[in-house]
Amino acid sequence: MHRTLSVRVAVLVALLVMAALLTGLAGCTPARDSMADVVEQDCLPGTACSKPIEIRIVLVTMFEIGEDEGDTAGEFQLWKERRGLSLRIPFPQSHHDLYLNPDTGVLGMVTGIGTAKSATATMALGLDPRFDLRKAYWLVAGIAGIDPADASIGSAVWSAHLVDGDLGHEIDAREMPKDWETGYFARYTRFPYDPDKPEPTGELFVTNIALRDWAFELTRNTPLPDLPGLAASRDKYTETEPARRPPFVLVGGHLAGMTFWHGEILNEWANRWVDYWTEGQSDFVTSAMEETGTFQAIEYLDRVGRVDRDRFMVLRAGSNYTMPPPGVGAAENLLAENEGYAGLQASVESLYLVGSVVIDELLRGWERYADVIPGDSRITPVSE
């Protein structure tokens, strides 16, 4: 009798334990037990996830060549292949799907070329209810034209002063007054480089300078690839020593515009235009087509608490020079570059190498950097 009762009690206890375990497993391990399942079933485009995906770093690239993997690399490919950006997240409201490393929280995007696409892609991501971007750092990593007076192709440039090259008045040079040196001048002014200019309303954006300086100090000694063929391109620039240096890391101003311009005259304009709007606080070093659109969207998103504008960084690497070497015409040089940028491979490698130093530091010290933006000189990098 006692033995039978003991057996029944033991069986009952075992059944209760098994039921509890099954209940617990049912509650803790849903059918969609992977991030991929969650994205596919619970995070459809245009809808909110049951729990937003927390992003630590948004990697902003502008274009890719061909496929995202396995062929000639544009701006996105090396990041996707080397940083485990393997989880595709459909993003039909923009130019290109997103790719996430669910283990690190690094999200890669390709905005498309030009300020219009970069602004709308950034806004689309910032307002996407699937993501929590409130503590995310943004790293723009793109190729650029580079001023031979400042650096060489393959060099990587951190920028905080972003000047727009589109907003303005313009008169054809053949119709401008004889005492003008250019037909392009600021809106609401009377002549080129009029000192009585209005406050910028899209002509100039300034990112977190302290964060820019922190990123530069962290990466300034990063060895950059000096690939075969670069020296031959550099050596043609006999009148500008920085253009002949092997690739290096520096800081400098950035000019963004929808027109791919080239030549000595426009290069001089770019230098004066950046100096004019920054009032001498920065010089022109790189030229591309997106930053003022991207950061305009960031500023709007910051106003509603979707992102933090102070966590935005710009890194550009020179794929080509913004003017030809001595003895070569502007049209001839531009058309040659259109056949393939001399520094494309070196520039995307430099972007990856330099940008990865910053990304690795942020991830390694996330417990700190989630709440404290680096840039305070009293903050020692976790890697030291």
Task: Name every feature range the model reports, one short phrase each.
Residues 11-24:
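Bacterial N-terminal signal peptides
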Residues 31-384:
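Accessory terminal and edge-of-domain segments that mediate assembly/interaction
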